[in-house]
C-alpha cells in the first residue's frame, strides 16, 4: 500500500502555507498556527488524508482506471508531465482548455487532428507541401501537442483527477464535479476545498512539495497496476467526501 510519512512532508516543506492575511477560513481546521505571518499547516491532519488519497489512487489503478494529473502553473507543469509519463497516466501541464471534460466530443476531434498531423509529419506529407503550408501545419501540430499531447492516449473521460493548486485549476474541478468524477487535490491555506473529494492540505507552490505529491501519486498508480488480481479486479467504489474534523 502506498504511504507517505511525516519526515517526507517536513523535508519537502508541505507544512508551509501562505501569508496569514490571505487565508481562507474554510481551511482553518487544517492550520496548526502561524510563524512570521505565515500559516503552518497541521501535518498531523495532512498525513492520514494524504495516505487516504494515495490508497484511493492505488485501488483505482488496480482496477485499470484512469487518473488524470492536472498542474498547469509554472512550478508544477514539468513535474506533472514527467511523473505522469513515468506511470503511464494522462496529464494536462500547460493550460486547461474549457470543456476538456464537459465537451469531450470536441476535444476528441482535436485529438484526431493532432494524430493526423503527427502522421503527416512522419510520412513525408509536410515535405510535399509549400513552405508556407508546411510551416502552418507544423505550428498547428505544436500548438495541439502542447495543449492535448498529455491526454491524446486517454481514450475517454478519466475516472479521477489529481490536481495541484485547486484555485488555479478551478475550471477543471468544476467540470469534474458536473460529471461526477472524483477530485483529489492539494489545498493550500489560501484556497477553498469546495468540490474536492480527497483533500490534501499542503503547500502547493514549493517545487519539493510538488515533487513529493506527484512522485507519491505516480508510485501509487504503478503499485496499483502491478497488483491487479489476475487482471480482473475493478474498483468502482464512489469517492468519499473528505470531511476531516
UniProtKB/Swiss-Prot annotation:
Keyword Ribonucleoprotein: yes
Disulfide bonds: none
UniProt entry keywords in alphabetical sequence: Ribonucleoprotein, Ribosomal protein
Any coiled-coil regions, as ranges: none
Gene3D superfamilies in the cross-refs: Glucose-6-phosphate isomerase like protein, domain 1, Helix hairpin bin
Domain of life: Bacteria
InterPro entries: Ribosomal_uS2, Ribosomal_uS2_bac/mit/plastid, Ribosomal_uS2_CS, Ribosomal_uS2_flav_dom_sf
A Pfam family hit: Ribosomal_S2
PROSITE patterns: RIBOSOMAL_S2_1 (PS00962), RIBOSOMAL_S2_2 (PS00963)
GO molecular-function term, one example from the UniProt record: structural constituent of ribosome
GO BP term, example: translation
GO cellular component: cytosolic small ribosomal subunit
PANTHER family: 30S RIBOSOMAL PROTEIN S2 PROKARYOTIC AND ORGANELLAR, SMALL RIBOSOMAL SUBUNIT PROTEIN US2M
Family stated for the protein in its record: Belongs to the universal ribosomal protein uS2 family.
NCBIfam families per the UniProt record, alphabetical: rpsB_bact
The protein's name in its UniProt record: Small ribosomal subunit protein uS2
Organism the protein comes from: Pseudomonas fluorescens (strain ATCC BAA-477 / NRRL B-23932 / Pf-5)
Amino acid at each position: 500500500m502506498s504511504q507517505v510519512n511525516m519526515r517526507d512532508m517536513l523535508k519537502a516543506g508541505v507544512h508551509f502555507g501562505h501569508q496569514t492575511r490571505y487565508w481562507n477560513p474554510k481551511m482553518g481546521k487544517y492550520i496548526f498556527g502561524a510563524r512570521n505571518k505565515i500559516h503552518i499547516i497541521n501535518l498531523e491532519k495532512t498525513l492520514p488524508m494524504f495516505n487516504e488519497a494515495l490508497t484511493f489512487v492505488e485501488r483505482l489503478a488496480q482496477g485499470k482506471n484512469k487518473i488524470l494529473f492536472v498542474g498547469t502553473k509554472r512550478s508544477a507543469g514539468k513535474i506533472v508531465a514527467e511523473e505522469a509519463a513515468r506511470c503511464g497516466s494522462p496529464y494536462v501541464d500547460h493550460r486547461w482548455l474549457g470543456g476538456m471534460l464537459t465537451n469531450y466530443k470536441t476535444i476528441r476531434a482535436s485529438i484526431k487532428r493532432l494524430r493526423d498531423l503527427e502522421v503527416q509529419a512522419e510520412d513525408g506529407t509536410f515535405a510535399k507541401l509549400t513552405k508556407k503550408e508546411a510551416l502552418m501545419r507544423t505550428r498547428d501540430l505544436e500548438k495541439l501537442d502542447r495543449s492535448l499531447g498529455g491526454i491524446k492516449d486517454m481514450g475517454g473521460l478519466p475516472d479521477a483527477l489529481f490536481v495541484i493548486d485547486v484555485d488555479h485549476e478551478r475550471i477543471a474541478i468544476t467540470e469534474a464535479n458536473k460529471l461526477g468524477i472524483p477530485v483529489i487535490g492539494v489545498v493550500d491555506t489560501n484556497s477553498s476545498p469546495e468540490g474536492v473529494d480527497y483533500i490534501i492540505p499542503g503547500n502547493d507552490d514549493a517545487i519539493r512539495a510538488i515533487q513529493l505529491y506527484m512522485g507519491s501519486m505516480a508510485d501509487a498508480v504503478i503499485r496499483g497496476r502491478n497488483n491487479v488480481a489476475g487482471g480482473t479486479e475493478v474498483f468502482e467504489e464512489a469517492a468519499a467526501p473528505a470531511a476531516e474534523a
